[in-house]
Amino acid sequence: MPFTLGQRWISDTESELGLGTVVAVDTRMVTLLFPATGENRLYARNDSPITRVVFNPGDTITSHEGWQLDVDEITTANGVVSYIGTRLDTSETGVVLREVMLDSKLVFGKPQDRLFAGQLDRMDRFALRFRARKYQSEQYRLATSGLRGMRTSLIPHQLHIAHDVGRRHAPRVLLADEVGLGKTIEAGMIIHQQLQAGRAERVLIVVPETLQHQWLVEMLRRFNLRFALFDDDRYAQAQLDSDNPFDTEQMIICSLDFVRRNKQRLEKLADAEWDLMVVDEAHHLVWSEDAPSREYQVIEQLAEQVPGILLLTATPEQLGMESHFARLRLLDPDRFHDFAQFVEEQKHFSPIADAVTLLLADQKIGNDELNLLNDLMGEQDIEPLLQTANSDREGKLAARQELISMLMDRHGTSRVLFRNTRNGVKGFPKRELHQIRLPLPTQYQTAIKVSGIMSARKTADERAQDMLYPEQIYQEFEGDSGTWWNFDPRVEWLMGYLTSNRDKKVLVICAKAATALQLEQVLREREGIRAAVFHEGLSIIERDRAAAWFASEEDGAQVLLCSEIGSEGRNFQFASQMVMFDLPFNPDLLEQRIGRLDRIGQVHDIQIHVPYLEKTAQAVLVQWYHEGLDAFEHTCPTGRAVYDSVYTQLIAYLAAPENSEGLEAFIQHCRKQHDTLKAQLEQGRDRLLELNSNGGEKGQALADMIAEQDNNIELVNFALNLFDIVGINQEDRSDNLIVLTPGDHMLVPDFPGLPEDGCTITFDRNQALSREDAQYVSWEHPIIRNGLDLILSGDTGSCAISLLKNKALPVGTLLVELIYVVEAQAPKHLQLTRFLPPTPIRMMVDRKGNNLAAKVEFESFNRQLNAVNRHTGSKLVNAVQSDVHEIITLSEDQAAAEARKVIDAARQEADEKLSAELSRLQALSAVNPNIRQDEIDALESNRQQVLSNLDEAGWRLDALRLIVVTHQ
């Protein structure tokens, strides 16, 4: 093409320079000025990597002054183009804009514009873009969306609760599962779903001070949720940045004490417009009608302002009726306003529970029971269902299940209360106790005697604490020269046990970090035992490394030595051997220790080894825990209640262990109290509530569905393809691990979600559960989500050119592969993507307008194509530009017809599902007062907005690929 001064060209290799202007031409060279950057480039006239830029009628162009022109016609004089059209800002027609006056900061937004401007992408990027569109659309539609990306085992009851509650508008519920059933994980799953769906953006977690770091770690490690921890220092720092310090972060964890201490701070917190608040250990909020505690009032004030509330608490039976009512009152003060009325209501639910038990028993239903069921559901004609349920006909089980579902919907608090027990959930191991009685060394005997004389002024509590840890007493007297580990028989026993069981992973827990550190040194120096240490002095990253070393099967540590505080929130199901080097002070801490191994998913029975010194507080405590509470071999829901009631006597025995008079009778008294309380708890079990909480077949179906998706290889292939194209380095490690590090030439300087020093990932859920240093990558992981956004929000892969070597077709045959996207713009909280995610429509159109896409599958066709370099590609495009324009025009009507089908189907699905959900809630609100009117109103509003936005859905060309047939 001849060059003329004033023409506009673009560089094929440096498109970031913008639009260039020809400023000098001689016989061999041409000079382009790029005004956007002020740079000049010199090119050879023949075969230079630049492309002529000429717009077409229908395009909108921008002048260097900023105004825009809709092009109606084009004229050329002496090789320079002028555009004639309508000016958008003044509506003036017949306006002439010479190409030399075009804006130099030109951005080609449409794929066809980029194609004609020579801004061609690599073929593999086009393929990645299409796959990204396809997979993203599929993922949005899955029923398990929001539930798959967590580093958790697939536990049916947890998935059921998260699926039910996570999809609600502003959920207000009580999570009251027994210990070890994963309330924290359920809460995290709900938070994760609410955030992903756009139902929540600002989340507050209020916890006891000792659990702050545990929550921080759990949210980050399991759900990839980065919370900010607010304490006095962080609050003071945030005050410099905002009038309301809590506005500086979207997701915050703070302690209840931090909020309670300062009235102004509480007001700021209440004003911060949270969408969801989680309160852990909510059973500690003391309430009575006459005198609610300050802590209760604090949470009550926040609960009045925050639309979504999750309260994590002990089981209702443990709490007692009044305390249970107090939690429900926080969730819905209008519904639960009168305690006496609440007690009366609860009595009316027993016939419902009886009816469910009857249906579950698969026995014939008598006349009295039939009348009861008719009375309970009097507003509906259930006679046909009852007849089927009471027969031997096909459909009997389905009829009974439907009746149970109908009863559950009417159950008083099953929408606001979820409570699972170990009795109702399978998958827990046995626990076996091994007591190792050891002699008390003379060194300790002497230290204890001297301590008794010197600490006469200490309280019984303080003396009891001292007596539990004789090594601490000894070390205090001896100072740095004390070496208790040289004579303590527990150390000798531990070394012997570990050397005899070198093939077993062993978790050793002791109360103090100093003890753990000293034991590590002894084990390493004396026996060469590899032991990782885990204590509160380590950073989260250091704890991760210690946990990963312990978890590793190859060259991993045999032992993990944990302090009491350091082990909070960490679980090691892959190990089944536990040694308690000493004992904790109360039953809750004991259960917390055992809970490190005793989790759902533990496949072996747990062996609990307790080496204790005779004639010490340890000997008293091990006997009390085992014989008085049965706390080692079974979970002990009564532990705290018994502990509180006998605290003074227990402390007296621990403070003076040599005085054992009456100890046996005391322990028998505790056991009797434990048995009585346990029987009361069992009697108070609510079978219907348990049935609703564990989800039954629904929960199992969710788990099976996710497990099947976990085994799909598509994610691995896509992710590795994404990392290659983005420029992320990958290094394979053993055990299904990959180390990712930023490359030198990435598509973006900083890839969101990838740390500067890299990270270790795995696509294997089980591997992620045992390797805490490895991130579990799923479709919901930030690295994948950010990768999808990076590709799809920009123009990566939006136009390409390929050669098809096929002798069955004439040379020069032209095909255009077009990817249209059907989409609707709407606020995220409407979750339009459930019905209409950005959906790709793939077309393969020839010169005659025939769409061949249905006959040519993408992946197999893509493998037959060959790449073209950018320079050759630009020449090909210029040669067939008019044909491509015509093919795109021919495709538009076909694309519109396909898009309309997609939109109509989405609208029909949305109308059916949302109307059914609304009708169900409206019908149930007549028989179940726990269905809030604001929930019904929100659903109706949501339905109307969803349908309205779907009516306005549109489509656009997202990417295209030019394919030219060759025989070479």
UniProtKB/Swiss-Prot annotation:
Enzyme Commission designation: 3.6.4.-
PANTHER family according to UniProt: DNA ANNEALING HELICASE AND ENDONUCLEASE ZRANB3 FAMILY MEMBER (PTHR45766), SWI_SNF-RELATED MATRIX-ASSOCIATED ACTIN-DEPENDENT REGULATOR OF CHROMATIN SUBFAMILY A-LIKE PROTEIN 1 (PTHR45766:SF6)
UniProt name for this protein: RNA polymerase-associated protein RapA
This protein's UniProt keywords: Activator, ATP-binding, DNA-binding, Helicase, Hydrolase, Nucleotide-binding, Transcription, Transcription regulation
Top EC class, one word: hydrolase
Residues annotated as domain Helicase C-terminal: 490-643
Domain Helicase ATP-binding: 164-334
Assembly behavior: Interacts with the RNAP. Has a higher affinity for the core RNAP than for the holoenzyme. Its ATPase activity is stimulated by binding to RNAP.
Classification of source organism: Bacteria, Pseudomonadati, Pseudomonadota, Gammaproteobacteria, Enterobacterales
Native species: Erwinia tasmaniensis (strain DSM 17950 / CFBP 7177 / CIP 109463 / NCPPB 4357 / Et1/99)
Keyword Mitochondrion attributed: no
Family of the protein in this entry: Belongs to the SNF2/RAD54 helicase family. RapA subfamily.
Protein purpose: Transcription regulator that activates transcription by stimulating RNA polymerase (RNAP) recycling in case of stress conditions such as supercoiled DNA or high salt concentrations. Probably acts by releasing the RNAP, when it is trapped or immobilized on tightly supercoiled DNA. Does not activate transcription on linear DNA. Probably not involved in DNA repair.
Source species, domain of life: Bacteria
